[in-house]
């Protein structure tokens, strides 16, 4: 059986850098900004990494629109295409098709039968 752990979490924020400062002060999370993607990332001890993504970004600028109150978890998968086929076969809906993150991997977003939006992620093979 394949492993499908939660590998990443996106927390929407009106000001990602301020959100990072808040969580660092309250929970001692390690915060780092990736200038390549203008993305503020966090690492919580003992948990998966994540990031603070800007609410209300221009829909044309990013392939997925984040909303306040919708924390998005990402499930790791070795085969996003196969996972999306299974989602559709079992009553889910693909919201964002497989999309490349250059030099990082691929991601996608689906809606489960209860209406929850969940992300999928596959890393670029390292060799």
Segments from the language model and where they lie:
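Vicinal oxygen chelate
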Residues: 1-7, 20-78, 82-111, 123-127
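Helix-turn-helix
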Residues: 10
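Conserved beta-strand-loop-alpha-helix junction that forms the acyl-donor binding cleft
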Residues: 13-15
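Glycine-rich acetyl-CoA-binding "A-motif" of GNAT/NAT acetyltransferases
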Residues: 117
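Short glycine-/small-residue motifs
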Residues: 120
């Amino acid at each position: 059986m394949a492993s499908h752990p939660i590998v990443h979490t996106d927390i929407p924020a009106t000001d990602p850098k301020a959100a990072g400062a808040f969580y660092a002060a309250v929970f001692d999370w390690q915060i780092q900004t990736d200038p390549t993607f203008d993305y503020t990332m966090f690492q919580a001890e003992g948990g998966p990494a994540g990031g603070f993504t800007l609410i209300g970004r221009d829909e044309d600028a990013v392939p997925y629109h984040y909303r306040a109150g919708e924390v998005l978890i990402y499930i790791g998968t070795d085969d996003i295409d196969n996972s999306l086929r299974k989602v559709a076969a079992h009553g889910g809906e693909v919201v964002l098709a497989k999309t490349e993150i250059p030099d990082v991997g691929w991601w996608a977003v689906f809606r489960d039968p209860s209406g929850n939006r969940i992300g999928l992620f596959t890393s670029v093979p390292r060799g």
